[in-house]
From Swiss-Prot:
Coiled coil: none annotated. InterPro entries: PsdUridine_synth_cat_dom_sf (IPR020103), PsdUridine_synth_N (IPR002501), tRNA_psdUridine_synth_TruB (IPR014780). This is tRNA pseudouridine synthase B. Belongs to the pseudouridine synthase TruB family. Type 1 subfamily. The active site is at D38 (nucleophile). Responsible for synthesis of pseudouridine from uracil-55 in the psi GC loop of transfer RNAs. Keywords: Isomerase, tRNA processing. It comes from Microcystis aeruginosa (strain NIES-843 / IAM M-2473). It is an enzyme of class 5 (isomerase). GO terms for molecular function: RNA binding; tRNA pseudouridine(55) synthase activity. Transmembrane segments: none annotated.
């Protein structure tokens, strides 16, 4: 088996739970995912099967989420599943007062990950430390948020705002919820989260585990998953050189050094990914990932 799945992760499942279930359904051990989703979250969880696990790092990085943020409430996990640590009811808070602050989170920003996260600190995961009551300083990380759009606003003692968020890899929406609450001086926590896009896969095209159990055929091909890359077809002679790890001379000089190119045979068999390099004024495609099916 070789290819990808666009899985719609159910609530209360870890990403690892989903991988284990897919392994069982497809009867294969070589399965991986393209980016962890918190157990409470739903939505797109890219799954790679077989040798496609080697291609996960080459999928598009941008992600999109639909998030509901509860204002006036702070929790230890920065989401609604955690323990409340502060409340600040604010029934008079309006959307007009919140909107200007959303712009503060657009662009390249420094973001502190939640204490309850899988990030390593001194060889241990942060959530392991948090569960033992060891709260430590977490260094901010640079992340990029491209767009934030307001979808809905619910008034009340604890107002709720629903957002459509487009961002880069590594962005924590729980941190965004917490930090929005901080700038408003009322606190905030993530009430619900759905990932609508990840690694080039869209929620509208996803399948759930029940559907996969009924029909486990039809993995997504690299041709679709790697459509953002340039592609090149090799003759049988060049395929042999490719399989031996030799760099392939390119006749087309209209290329960008360092760019990645997906490779297939004339029969459309996927062969891997190469990087364009230059040596002695000649352009070559250097194998990075070689796939022999």
């Amino acid at each position: 088996m070789f290819g990808f799945l666009n899985l719609n992760k159910p609530p209360d499942w870890t990403s690892h739970d989903c991988v284990a279930k897919v392994r069982k359904i497809l009867k294969t051990k070589r399965v991986g995912h393209g980016g962890t989703l918190d157990p409470m979250a739903t939505g797109v969880l890219p799954i790679a099967v077989g040798a496609a696990t080697r291609l996960l790092a080459y999928l598009p990085e941008n992600k999109a989420y639909r998030a509901k943020i509860q204002l006036g409430l702070s929790t230890d996990t920065d989401d609604i599943t955690g323990k409340a640590i502060a409340t600040c009811p604010w029934p008079d808070l309006t959307l007009e007062a919140v909107k200007p602050h959303l712009a503060e989170f657009i662009g390249n920003i420094a973001q502190i990950p939640p204490m309850y996260s899988a990030i390593h600190k001194d060889g241990r995961r942060l959530y392991e430390l948090a569960r033992k009551g060891e709260i430590i300083a977490v260094e901010p990380r640079q992340v990029k948020i491209d767009q934030i759009t307001v979808l809905d606003w619910l008034e009340g003692e604890f107002p709720q705002i629903e957002l459509d968020i487009h961002c880069g890899s590594g962005t924590y929406i729980r941190s965004l919820a917490r930090d929005l609450g901080k700038v408003l001086a009322v606190g905030g926590t993530l009430a619900s989260l759905t990932r609508t896009e990840s690694c080039g896969f869209q929620l509208a095209d996803s399948i759930n585990l029940e559907a996969l159990m009924v029909n486990s055929e039809g993995l997504i091909s690299p041709r679709i998953a790697l459509a953002h890359l340039d592609w090149i077809s090799f003759t049988p002679e060049r395929v042999i050189d490719w399989f031996h790890g030799r760099k392939i001379n390119l006749t087309d000089t209209n290329v960008i050094i360092g760019s990645l190119v997906a490779v297939e045979s004339l029969e459309a068999q996927f062969l891997g990914i190469g990087e364009i390099v230059v040596a002695e004024d000649e352009y070559y495609l250097q194998p990075k990932i070689v796939i022999q099916q």
